[in-house]
């Protein structure tokens, strides 16, 4: 086990980096506190609305569909990254890599078909979809 003097000699660069980060952080916070505006008033607590008088509350309830679409996007986006990594190394991976990528794509498509079949990708309720289908006829 190295003694403390050897550790200090070995990690002096990291310690200097941390000291620089803390110093820069203190400098930026100090300058912003000195130069920043200190105006307090009733209008300070109101949200900025581009010159439009705000109406109603600032809290807006979003449908759970937005969160579902966001999660599906993240999942399929990460899977697209895996496919991109495979496409970069397709020559090195050979036939085994092609078979694995084909299985991976098949699993992706099965997941997409499953989500489609259970209605996870439908934005409108079923009653509204039936009503719109009748209107199109």
UniProtKB/Swiss-Prot annotation:
Major enzyme class: translocase
Membrane topology recorded in Swiss-Prot or TrEMBL: Multi-pass membrane protein
UniProt cross-references to InterPro entries, sorted A to Z: NAD(P)H_OxRDtase_bac/plastid, NADH_UbQ/plastoQ_OxRdtase_su3, NDAH_ubi_oxred_su3_sf
Bilayer-crossing regions: 14-34, 66-86, 95-115
Known EC number: 7.1.1.-
UniProt keyword Phosphoprotein present: no
Keywords: Cell inner membrane, Cell membrane, Membrane, NAD, Quinone, Translocase, Transmembrane, Transmembrane helix, Transport, Ubiquinone
Location(s), subcellular: Cell inner membrane
The reaction(s) this protein catalyses: a quinone + NADH + 5 H(+)(in) = a quinol + NAD(+) + 4 H(+)(out)
Pfam family, one: Oxidored_q4
Molecular function GO labels: NADH dehydrogenase (ubiquinone) activity; NADH:ubiquinone reductase (non-electrogenic) activity; quinone binding
GO CC list: NADH dehydrogenase complex; plasma membrane
Family: Belongs to the complex I subunit 3 family.
HAMAP family to which the protein is assigned, alphabetical: NDH1_NuoA
Complexes and interactors: NDH-1 is composed of 13 different subunits. Subunits NuoA, H, J, K, L, M, N constitute the membrane sector of the complex.
UniProt function note: NDH-1 shuttles electrons from NADH, via FMN and iron-sulfur (Fe-S) centers, to quinones in the respiratory chain. The immediate electron acceptor for the enzyme in this species is believed to be ubiquinone. Couples the redox reaction to proton translocation (for every two electrons transferred, four hydrogen ions are translocated across the cytoplasmic membrane), and thus conserves the redox energy in a proton gradient.
Designated name of the protein: NADH-quinone oxidoreductase subunit A 1
Organism: Pseudomonas paraeruginosa (strain DSM 24068 / PA7)
